[in-house]
Design a protein with these regions (language model features):
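Active-site acidic catalytic loop and adjacent metal/ATP-binding pocket
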Residues: 70, 78-120
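Active-site Asp-x-Gly
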Residues: 102-149
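ATP-dependent phospho-/nucleotidyl transfer catalytic cores
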Residues: 4-6, 31-93, 206-210
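Central hydrophobic cores of alpha-helical transmembrane segments
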Residues: 150-157
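ATP-binding pocket architecture of kinase catalytic cores
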Residues: 1-31
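Alpha-helical structural elements of signaling/regulatory helical domains
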Residues: 27, 31, 55-58, 62, ...
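ATP/Mg2+ or Mg2+-diphosphate-binding catalytic cores
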Residues: 162-212
Length: 212
């Protein structure tokens, strides 16, 4: 009683099916204020950790560039979040990590109740869907203006970098390699964000980040 047994059987699957499920609205809502408070706390903690790292990471100027860039993105994301009119957003069954992998997509420990656009934003950021597919999902799911604003703010918020800065040793060789890959991908990421902004701006007026 009150337990569910999950078993795994590797089989053919379609990633789009999981994304469609994540967009189905639940009879639950998430508070925008709590999202903002969470992001502010993450940003503050990351800034503190970054300050500690900056004084002892030698010969790794990429880290300094990344830290300023991603802190700027985080602050921009919170600023966009302030454009949302409603106090709550519709929730869906989302994933902590949205990866095109059957076991990860089905793993109960990887599921979370959050705004129903979380997986959609992660899929675009991780290059799992194109901007054309992103727009199709927006139309099919009939996202509200506030959900579109939140979607854009999620695209901006640098969760991956913040998680590395907070939870990992940025002096570690493997982490440095990951950070270097991020640094080398900045231009592509900027272009992807601009393309998304141009598309989303057709549905509602979104603030433009001048330095992107």
């Amino acid at each position: 009683m009150d337990y569910i047994l999950y078993t795994y059987q590797i089989e053919d699957y379609h990633f789009e099916m999981f994304l469609q499920y994540s967009l189905r609205p639940l009879d639950i809502q998430v508070e925008v204020l709590k999202i903002k408070e969470s992001w502010c706390a993450i940003l503050d903690e990351a800034k503190c950790k970054i300050g500690n790292y900056a004084s002892r990471i030698s010969h790794f100027e990429h880290f300094v560039v990344l830290s300023y860039y991603y802190q700027g993105l985080g602050e921009a994301a919170i600023s966009v979040l302030n454009e949302i009119k409603e106090t709550k957003l519709v929730a869906g069954i989302e994933h902590f990590n949205m990866i095109d992998n059957y076991e990860m997509l089905c793993c109960p420990a990887n599921l979370v109740i959050a705004s129903r656009v979380k997986d959609l934003a992660s899929s675009y950021k991780n290059n799992l869907i194109s901007v054309e597919q992103l727009e199709e999902y927006i139309q099919i799911s009939a996202l509200t203006v506030d959900e579109i604003i939140y979607l854009y703010s999620r695209l901006l918020f640098p969760s991956e970098f913040m998680q590395l800065a907070i939870n990992d040793d940025c002096n570690d060789a493997q982490i440095k390699k990951t950070l270097l890959n991020m640094y080398q991908n900045i231009d592509n990421q900027k272009a992807s964000l601009v393309i998304a902004w141009q598309m989303l701006n057709k549905y509602t007026r979104l603030p433009k980040i001048a330095w992107l």
